[in-house]
């Protein structure tokens, strides 16, 4: 049987209500939405690339001579497997597209696999082709050219594991957490002239996804409202008018109840709605605004001729209105009045009246208000004009007012009504609606008139022929209400809903006034309702948009010089198509959010792909991010992990989503809750965003009774960022799982609830630094998340389809697929799945990936089953470290301050041994003086130094190399010397002379040693000549390809014969069949022997053997299918061969590239860093012989001795609980081993395991589970599982916040025959004496981290020097020295170590002559030296001379000691 993960004893709930979602869904779904690769190209949704193309096209030049229209796009090469058809210009290839010739589905043809791209240093990508149609203007309209597919370049694709491969390196795009578009309200202190008074300025900002920010400010000092667009201040009413609220009446009717509009006739006022007659005196206690018409001039414009104007004016008293009515020069058009008592009682107060009054009060000498425009225009045009003047910085206008208004209208439409320039985005619309509009979820017949006061709405469900998403109108509602009593609606987020609407401005002002009066709170920028995730798809979309903008500019430029009458125009003549893919590729290569993938182990890879960052373009900077943004926020609950974040300057800015978090369609993090109805928990799951959950009472995951009712009398619940005790009936939702609040990394820490947060942070971060070990071991004490993380990180191999294991070896697994899972429509589906395993591959961090099969030949495999382990996994579970026996006690001072004492057993038995792979490469290039060459003929190198190289000068695989060894021999031509006539004659007679070359070989760098495990050679194509090396490489690759082809053919034939045997074995031949010279007699039974001999004849001519038509048809189908499959395989082989023979494109100037991979086995040693999962880290201080380690009463020596003082102050008690439980788990396993040795039967062992699993099991789930599991096993499987338990111990899972309780741990220790306090007497390994006090002992999962001493230790005698100062370079990478700074000099001075100090500052640093002399003296065995003058002193002298200061250094005899040397150098 397969090596299955042993069932764990669970302390929490074994079965979750909701399984955590796929952990890489955030980046993968985002990219899939961007490219929509698995969607029919003719049915793509309007998102991602499709949305960019649809909104950017058609391109039009200014004169509209040419129009370029978009019809669709295809990604990748597509082909029909059945007939070989490839889509032409008139058909887009893609998913679910039918072949026009034979009707089969088109199939995607991958040029290179991700593995090949990594190997060859290529980008994993596919061609992007866009179908465009060009139209050219003619006298009779537009001439349409046939659609063309234009090649836009290669678009990088995401691999199955969620990363990108760019030039052979694996990279990922970090998810960005940015401020959402929408409306935000805040308040800040307003600057006052009098510094003693502070007033608050209240602000509401509309932040679009694209375009200008519109802000309204309400001054706490004056109660007046002003507006800002792009920070430029202008009148608030001007902005309102520009957006469509033209008059005072249009504005005020939304704020006050009794607003009346009057029409003026014969100096009497008539109510516009009722027709009732009023006199001016009736408006005595009213605020009055009048629209008047008069003849006059407008100052400040080019023309000052008299014309009719309309103006809106604030009338302070009713008598002023009488005067206006009596004035023959003025015509009062309408009057708006609001009763003063209505304004006083209104929640919106006088702010709006005062603002309108302020803007429309007479300001100049002739008592005219500024709100006026020519009579043929409207007051909206006044608002547009004001906005245009302010935003375009126009002070004195030299144009006619008509031109200004016309321009202002165009300006507004471009600025605020063009999706290319201004877009709130779907997110912005949803956020505005949620913030300031009260949108009902359901509309009833009485609500029809409400539509005018709401932003656009859409149907939330299908209603008959009207689909969900259809825009709601009054007519539609009236029609639907004939059939339905209520209609469910949602936000409409397309068309004009993407712009600012008048009703938005009204409700924003209402909210702003409410904020001023303390009825609502200001927005919290750290709240996750105001921050959204921009994942990889959206980030790439933004880049593509920039590329399209450049392309459109090129289109306009080229259109100007092309004649529309030309006969053969193509889209390529007008655009540079590479802009889009170049923008995307550049972002992946150099973008701020594009990072080198951290794949130290599967957990680090998974976490890196899920990471959220507040940094990057459009985000925050480390310097500007305040504490509030970095801090844990209540809205993070269930969305962002409060534990996992870096410790440095990025703390709180780089975070991780929780296990259950997902991203909704608008980019907000959502988390699942179970619905609670009347105190009863239902199984209905709802996903809520942070801004949605605020209105609900949500309880944490709480125990329920059998009926699902909440047990407790009072329950701790959250409501509006507040935590309080509520009754069960008040609870509306309940958490899905206690692990809902933490990330995958944190969820791997057992007893997390007993660790201090700071240490848990270190624990979750250090697990990502654990090095994959040679022998992996899943933790004895886990949390139950190990399997989920191993699977979702793609470290393990999972069966795509069920079947039987046909063949298995260390490098591949072949599974014959179940017949019902084979796709018979695809000729390439041969019913065989081949899984190539990754063997000893290097990761970005130089760790080793190695996959191992865990299934056997002949075994049945289910779809989704784990069939191979990867690095840091054990039987499909994550295994980052090893369970070792630890003791908490001091040991002779060696574990002082977190140092760790380890046993030599861990070194000898390779417990913590890991493999590290170094990749070195060398290029042979073309130089000005000739070509470099990879060769074994290296001048000046003795033969023994070349012993390990092959005939081409490349190191042999399997060689053990040390620093300084030649890995690849390379020679570079020196500059050609001028030949003498004699040499020229000799050269002419004897041909080419031996070239003058120098050694430029690749040598093993310092600090690198190990075994060469692989050598890869790449040669350039199209050079016209092939050297022996290139031919050898080509030959080997072709042989591998042929072997693969033969293997697949054999598998097809084996499968064919298997199916055929099922049809004909045991049947009789129904007529005499002549086969060559032989005859198969009628009635002959077809057995194995006959079948083997005549199988090909039966397939070729079944009618010669049988008369059953149905059987003959089936045999022919099998033969035809096999023939088609072998033909297709041959075709694929020929394509691969052609690609291979083209050979790899190397960078310009490179002839040959050789890569050498050196594997180094690193045992654990002094200086390596180790850690537990609880933030308990330390460096190994000593490796003790096993016999010196403290030992248990039974003689077992401990593996690691930790300092007990590392626990109390760090408050990570989880490690102690893990140690106790680990000891119990191990000893219980030994007890089972003893039972096996005593020959106890299956029943007794099952009962014993049931007893163990029942401890701490409140609802009996565990005991029932283990009994059912063991009873389901065959005899062989049962004893295999039980022996594993005996050898490994009983694995347990203590999930976070549901961990094992103290009583359960004590009971398990007791069951294992161990002391309940988890302590025992230890004996000193050196003296054999018992220690005075009992010591805490047990098993803990310890990790070896990537911070290894071999990467850090460094020593230098001589090496490279800086050119100017002649001092040694710095750093290990440069093989540099150690800097001796001022403080070190002072220390040596203080010690009086004059000679030491002198040599440090001279011969050991930058005394060029002195250091040479010292070296010579040491070689001769003499140990004296005379220091010279340091180079840095000479540099100082030269710098002073450059300043015009002649410096003389005088010795005791008053002779210049420096000048001679300086002069000598100057003469040179």
UniProtKB/Swiss-Prot annotation:
Entry keyword set: DNA-directed RNA polymerase, Nucleotidyltransferase, Transcription, Transferase
Range of residues in the leader sequence: none
Gene3D superfamilies: 2.40.50.100, 2.40.50.150, 3.90.1100.10, DNA-directed RNA polymerase, beta subunit, external 1 domain, DNA-directed RNA polymerase, subunit 2, domain 6, RNA polymerase alpha subunit dimerisation domain, RNA polymerase Rpb2, domain 2
Cellular component GO terms held in the UniProt record: DNA-directed RNA polymerase complex
EC main group: transferase
Pfam families assigned: RNA_pol_Rpb2_1, RNA_pol_Rpb2_2, RNA_pol_Rpb2_3, RNA_pol_Rpb2_45, RNA_pol_Rpb2_6, RNA_pol_Rpb2_7
Annotated catalysed reactions: RNA(n) + a ribonucleoside 5'-triphosphate = RNA(n+1) + diphosphate
Keyword Transferase assigned: yes
Top-level division of the source organism's lineage: Bacteria
GO molecular function terms noted in the UniProt entry: DNA binding; DNA-directed RNA polymerase activity; ribonucleoside binding
InterPro entries: DNA-dir_RNA_pol_bsu_ext_1_sf, DNA-dir_RNA_pol_bsu_external_1, DNA-dir_RNA_pol_su2, DNA-dir_RNAP_su2_dom, DNA-dir_RNAP_su2_hyb_sf, RNA_pol_bsu_bac, RNA_pol_bsu_CS, RNA_pol_bsu_protrusion
GO BP, sorted A to Z: DNA-templated transcription
Subunit text: The RNAP catalytic core consists of 2 alpha, 1 beta, 1 beta' and 1 omega subunit. When a sigma factor is associated with the core the holoenzyme is formed, which can initiate transcription.
Assigned protein family: Belongs to the RNA polymerase beta chain family.
Physiological role: DNA-dependent RNA polymerase catalyzes the transcription of DNA into RNA using the four ribonucleoside triphosphates as substrates.
Protein name according to UniProt: DNA-directed RNA polymerase subunit beta
């Amino acid at each position: 049987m397969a090596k299955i993960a042993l069932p764990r004893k669970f302390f929490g709930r074994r079965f979750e209500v909701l399984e955590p979602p796929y952990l890489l869904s955030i980046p993968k779904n985002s990219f899939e939405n961007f490219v929509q690769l698995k969607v029919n190209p003719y049915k793509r949704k309007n998102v991602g690339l499709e949305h960019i193309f649809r909104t950017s096209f058609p391109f039009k030049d200014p004169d509209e001579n040419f129009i370029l229209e978009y019809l669709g796009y295809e990604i990748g090469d597509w082909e029909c497997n059945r007939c070989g058809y490839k889509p032409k210009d008139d058909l887009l290839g893609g998913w679910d597209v039918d072949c026009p010739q034979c009707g089969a589905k088109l199939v995607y043809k991958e040029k290179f696999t991700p593995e090949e791209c990594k190997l060859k240093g290529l980008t994993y990508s596919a061609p992007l082709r866009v179908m465009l149609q060009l139209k050219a203007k003619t006298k009779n309209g537009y001439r349409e050219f046939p659609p063309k597919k234009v090649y836009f370049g290669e678009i990088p694709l995401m691999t199955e594991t969620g990363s990108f491969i760019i030039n052979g390196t694996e990279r990922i795009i970090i998810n960005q957490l940015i401020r959402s578009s929408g409306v935000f309200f805040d308040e800040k202190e307003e600057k006052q002239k009098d510094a003693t008074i502070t007033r608050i300025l209240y602000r509401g900002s509309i932040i679009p996804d694209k375009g200008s920010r519109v802000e309204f400010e309400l001054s706490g000092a004056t109660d007046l409202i002003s507006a800002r667009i792009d920070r430029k201040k202008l009148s608030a009413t001007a902005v309102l008018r520009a957006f469509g609220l033209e008059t005072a009446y249009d504005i005020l009717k939304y704020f006050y109840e009794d607003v009346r509009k009057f029409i003026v006739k014969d100096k009497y006022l008539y109510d516009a709605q009722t027709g009732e007659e009023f006199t001016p005196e009736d408006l005595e206690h009213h605020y009055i605004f009048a629209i008047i018409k008069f003849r006059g001039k407008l100052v400040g414009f080019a023309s000052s001729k008299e014309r009719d104007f309309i103006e809106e004016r604030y009338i302070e008293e009713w008598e002023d209105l009488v005067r206006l009515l009596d004035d023959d020069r003025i015509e009062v058009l309408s009057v708006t009045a609001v009763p003063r008592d209505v304004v006083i009682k209104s929640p919106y107060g006088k702010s709006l009246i005062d603002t309108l009054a302020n803007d429309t009060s007479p300001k100049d000498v002739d008592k005219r208000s500024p709100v006026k425009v020519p009579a043929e225009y409207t007051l909206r045009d006044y608002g547009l004009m004001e906005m245009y003047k302010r935003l375009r910085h126009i002070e004195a206008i030299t144009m006619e007012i008509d031109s200004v208004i016309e321009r202002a209208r165009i300006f507004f439409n471009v600025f605020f009504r063009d999706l290319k320039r201004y877009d709130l985005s779907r997110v912005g619309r949803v956020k505005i609606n949620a913030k300031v509009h009260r949108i009902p979820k359901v509309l009833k017949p009485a609500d029809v008139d409400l539509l005018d006061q709401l932003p656009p709405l859409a149907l939330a469900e299908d209603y008959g022929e009207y689909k969900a998403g259809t825009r709601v109108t009054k007519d539609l509602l009236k029609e639907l209400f004939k059939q339905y009593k209520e209609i469910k609606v949602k936000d409409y987020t397309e068309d004009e809903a993407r712009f600012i609407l008048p009703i938005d401005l009204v409700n924003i002002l209402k909210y702003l006034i409410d904020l001023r009066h303390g009825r609502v709170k200001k927005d919290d920028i750290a709240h996750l309702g105001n921050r959204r995730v921009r994942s990889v798809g959206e980030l790439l979309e933004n880049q593509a948009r920039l590329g399209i903008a450049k392309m459109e500019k090129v289109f306009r430029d080229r259109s100007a010089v092309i004649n529309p009458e030309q006969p053969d125009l193509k889209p390529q003549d007008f655009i540079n198509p590479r802009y889009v893919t170049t923008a995307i590729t550049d972002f992946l290569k150099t973008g701020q959010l594009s990072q080198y993938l951290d794949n130290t182990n599967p957990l680090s890879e998974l976490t890196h792909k899920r990471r959220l960052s507040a940094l990057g373009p459009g985000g925050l900077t480390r310097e500007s991010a305040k504490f509030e943004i970095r801090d844990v926020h209540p809205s993070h609950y269930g969305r962002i992990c409060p534990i996992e974040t870096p410790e440095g300057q990025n703390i709180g800015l780089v975070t991780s989503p929780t296990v259950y978090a997902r991203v909704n369609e608008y980019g907000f993090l959502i988390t699942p809750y179970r619905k609670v109805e009347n105190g009863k928990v239902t199984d209905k799951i709802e996903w809520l965003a942070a801004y949605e959950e605020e209105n609900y009472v949500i309880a944490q995951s709480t125990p329920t009774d059998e009926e699902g009712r909440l047990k407790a009398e009072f329950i701790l619940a959250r409501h509006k960022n507040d935590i309080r005790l509520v009754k069960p009936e008040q609870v509306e939702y309940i958490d899905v799982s206690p692990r809902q609040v933490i990330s995958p990394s944190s969820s791997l820490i057992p007893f997390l609830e007993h660790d201090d947060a700071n240490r848990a942070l270190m624990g979750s971060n250090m697990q990502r630094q654990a090095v994959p070990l040679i022998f992996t071991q899943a933790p004895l004490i886990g949390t139950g998340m190990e399997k989920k993380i191993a699977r979702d990180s793609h470290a393990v191999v999972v069966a795509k389809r069920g079947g039987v294991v046909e063949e298995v070896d260390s490098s591949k697994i072949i599974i014959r697929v179940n017949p019902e899972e084979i796709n018979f429509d695809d000729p390439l589906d041969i019913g065989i799945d081949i899984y190539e395993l990754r063997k000893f591959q290097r990761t970005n961090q130089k760790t080793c990936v190695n996959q191992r099969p865990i299934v056997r030949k002949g075994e049945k495999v289910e779809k989704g089953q784990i069939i191979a382990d990867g690095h840091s996994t054990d039987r499909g579970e994550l295994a980052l470290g090893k369970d070792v026996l630890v003791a908490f006690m001091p040991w002779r001072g060696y574990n002082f301050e977190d140092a760790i004492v380890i046993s030599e057993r861990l070194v000898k038995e390779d417990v913590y041994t890991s493999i590290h792979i170094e990749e070195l490469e060398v290029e042979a290039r073309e130089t000005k003086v000739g070509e470099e060459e990879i060769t074994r003929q290296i001048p000046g190198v003795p033969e023994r130094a070349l012993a390990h190289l092959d005939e081409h000068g490349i190191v042999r695989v399997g060689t053990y190399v040390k620093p300084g060894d030649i890995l690849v021999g390379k020679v570079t031509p020196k500059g050609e010397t001028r030949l003498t006539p004699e040499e020229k004659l000799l050269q002419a007679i004897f041909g080419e002379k031996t070239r003058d070359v120098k050694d430029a070989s690749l040598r093993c760098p310092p600090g690198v040693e190990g075994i060469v495990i692989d050598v890869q050679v790449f040669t350039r194509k199209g050079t016209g000549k092939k050297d022996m090396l290139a031919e050898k490489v080509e030959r080997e690759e072709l042989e591998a390809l042929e072997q693969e082809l033969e293997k697949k053919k054999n598998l097809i034939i084996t499968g064919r014969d298997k199916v055929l045997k099922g049809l004909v074995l045991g049947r009789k031949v129904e007529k005499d069949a002549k086969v060559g010279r032989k005859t198969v007699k009628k009635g002959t039974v077809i057995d194995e022997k006959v079948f083997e001999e005549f199988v090909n004849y039966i397939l070729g001519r079944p009618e010669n053997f049988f008369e059953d038509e149905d059987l003959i048809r089936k045999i022919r189908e099998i033969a035809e299918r096999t023939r088609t499959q072998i033909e297709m395989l041959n075709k694929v082989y020929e394509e691969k061969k052609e690609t291979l023979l083209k050979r790899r494109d190397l960078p310009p100037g490179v002839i040959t590239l050789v890569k050498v991979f050196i594997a180094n086995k690193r045992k654990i040693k002094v200086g390596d860093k180790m850690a537990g999962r609880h933030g308990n880290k330390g460096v190994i201080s000593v490796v003790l012989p096993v016999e010196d380690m403290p030992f248990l009463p039974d003689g077992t020596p401990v593996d690691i001795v930790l300092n007990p003082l590392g626990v109390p102050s760090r408050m990570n008690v989880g490690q102690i609980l893990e140690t106790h439980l680990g000891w119990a788990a191990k000893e219980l396993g030994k007890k089972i081993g003893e039972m096996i040795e005593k020959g106890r039967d299956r029943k007794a062992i099952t009962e014993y395991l049931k007893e163990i699993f029942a401890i701490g099991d409140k609802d009996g789930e565990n005991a029932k589970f283990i009994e059912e599991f063991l009873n389901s096993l065959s005899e062989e499987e049962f004893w295999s599982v039980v022996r594993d338990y005996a050898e490994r111990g009983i694995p347990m899972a203590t999930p976070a916040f549901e961990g094992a309780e103290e009583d359960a741990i004590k009971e398990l220790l007791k069951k294992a025959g161990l002391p309940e306090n988890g302590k025992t007497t230890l004996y000193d390994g050196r003296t054999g004496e018992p220690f005075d006090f009992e010591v805490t002992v047990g098993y803990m999962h310890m990790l070896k981290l990537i911070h290894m001493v071999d990467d850090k230790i460094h020593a230098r005698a001589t090496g490279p020097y800086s050119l100017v100062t002649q001092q040694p370079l710095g750093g290990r990478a440069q093989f540099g020295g150690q800097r001796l700074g001022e403080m070190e000099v002072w220390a040596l001075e203080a010690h009086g170590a004059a000679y030491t100090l002198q040599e440090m500052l001279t011969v050991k640093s930058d005394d060029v002559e002195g250091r040479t002399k010292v070296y010579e003296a040491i070689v001769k065995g003499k140990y004296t030296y005379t220091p010279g003058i340091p180079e840095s002193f000479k540099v100082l002298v030269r710098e002073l001379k450059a300043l015009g200061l002649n410096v003389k250094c005088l010795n005791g005899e008053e002779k210049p000691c420096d000048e001679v040397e300086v002069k000598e150098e100057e003469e040179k």
